[in-house]
Amino acid sequence: MSRQDGKRDRGRHEAASVAGETGLLAILAILIANEVEFLLIGGLAVGHHGYPRATKDVDIVPAPDSKNLEQLWAALVELGAQPLAIGAFRPQELPLPFSLDALLQGGNWDLSTIHGRLDIIQYREGALETADDYKQLRSGAVPGDYHFGRVWVVGYEDLIDLKTLAGRDQDLVDIRALREANEDTAP
């Protein structure tokens, strides 16, 4: 499979060969079966773009329209999703209880499911602040085809931008590895 810039997507499905990823792929399959529109970001997207590595979760950005978020909620119910504790807070101490209404209000959720961890990112300062930001990311997304259906993966440059904004140690490692894997000489 080729990317829009002509470079080969070397990571396509390679992430699936990493031990322990079967559960994570099951999360994607359930999202697809529930017709959830989303973009794959995070470690699985890094693998898709040429640097397969182990990851502990599936990271997605869902399309922000209410119908899609209702479909996402149905998938979350099927997955038995429950919020993880955030820092010193237990799930019951969060300002909004985990519900469809809370999902519709936006925000980010770190969830435990029957197949592993799922992180839902609906807001990221500088990248995901409006519905138009999702549309922009979606316009640069590339397909990833699996036996259970097509997943849209955030584009290479957008992934680099999201990783740069997050700025965690793992994100910086991913950026370097992606650039090496894709022979990208940008700083």
Residue ranges with predicted function:
Residues 1-187:
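Compositionally biased terminal segments of proteins
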